[in-house]
Amino acid sequence: MSSAIKEVQGAPVKWVTNWTPEAIRGLVDQEKGLLDPRIYADQSLYELELERVFGRSWLLLGHESHVPETGDFLATYMGEDPVVMVRQKDKSIKVFLNQCRHRGMRICRSDAGNAKAFTCSYHGWAYDIAGKLVNVPFEKEAFCDKKEGDCGFDKAEWGPLQARVATYKGLVFANWDVQAPDLETYLGDARPYMDVMLDRTPAGTVAIGGMQKWVIPCNWKFAAEQFCSDMYHAGTTTHLSGILAGIPPEMDLSQAQIPTKGNQFRAAWGGHGSGWYVDEPGSLLAVMGPKVTQYWTEGPAAELAEQRLGHTGMPVRRMVGQHMTIFPTCSFLPTFNNIRIWHPRGPNEIEVWAFTLVDADAPAEIKEEYRRHNIRNFSAGGVFEQDDGENWVEIQKGLRGYKAKSQPLNAQMGLGRSQTGHPDFPGNVGYVYAEEAARGMYHHWMRMMSEPSWATLKP
């Protein structure tokens, strides 16, 4: 056990306020499956996260269909930094800091819409849709030398900070770090598992039902880890009542069984992970109903998806109930087709942004089924959403204590059992009820926090 985690019963904890790389590396022991609880509750660690994780990772902002036309925008966040995602005249997408360069006021105060320009409501500095400063009130009178006629103020130098932007099959990501690897390299061997939802048809995907937002008083890593690695909670106690309530009335509840067949994937690099059931459609039926279940597992759409993704070797029609996280805060549920962004709000709170994604050429009836069932199950008041939120909130409450942060947490399930060479699924794969992907996520978190240079951190 690493020295930073090791705790002799009754001995004092060594609290760290200046987190050195060595101290950070001691917070996560992937070889023994141990986590220091302070990673969820320490303010100074969180401040480092904003710089070293959220300042260097590819972060999901939304879907291309959120900004279909020139001037369409979505105001969102990268970490705690407000940004604007805008469709350009050439149909590209730009992302820039939602901050006026004069006194720092937001230049866009609407959640979404269409604009020809963005004007700061404080002093009226105006920016075009590319983020270029185009108008400053009293520019000549206030900034120029009237006697010499020389104006040392150059508007071209005072646009908001621009982020790198890249898309993957409809999803829009951005990154502040010019040294970070490109998006496809960053996603790495997780891409086939993303494609199960994103690339089922040549028509691609479309976001429906708007963006739902709510706040949960918990650390962002609890949410990210659950979608990365934790089928365990769904197969034990957390969601059983909701699943049983969704079983069709004609079925005999005494015959209901917890799924036992499935797998989990850990990315070779990057902290990404996924899990899914195989040949266990009962959970999908209980959550999404018979129409969505049939659409995903049978018929022309399912056959097309399996053919289209045949190069992966994965039996995509047999994969149900999938969960996935692209580190750090992009999470989604293929088959349920719900996407989440966990915006951090300090070490003890997240703002959840969620939307539903469907095949663009799916029948209207199927799109409506997805929309309706996602509201019922995965909205702020959804059947399963309330279960998850309650668990995360209660954990975070406990971490206010001194002793609660002094005992290492167990992440040992399936330790050493995952391996490459699975006959159906690519990459490092193990049993569905495991924590290999969680260990990968926390190990990558530890590396990003302790390795400032991409020379050592890169894939």
From Swiss-Prot:
Question: Could you tell me the keywords of this UniProt record?
Answer: 2Fe-2S, Aromatic hydrocarbons catabolism, Dioxygenase, Iron, Iron-sulfur, Metal-binding, NAD, Oxidoreductase
List ligand-binding residues for Fe cation. Answer: 233, 239
* Top-rank lineage group of the source organism: Bacteria
The enzyme's main class, written as a single word, is oxidoreductase
Q: What is its EC number?
A: 1.14.12.18
Cofactors required: [2Fe-2S] cluster; Fe cation
GO terms classed as biological process: catabolic process
The family note in this entry says: Belongs to the bacterial ring-hydroxylating dioxygenase alpha subunit family.
Q: How does it assemble?
A: Heterohexamer consisting of three BphA subunits and three BphE subunits. A ferredoxin (BphF) and a ferredoxin reductase (BphG) must be present to obtain activity.
- UniProt name for this protein: Biphenyl dioxygenase subunit alpha
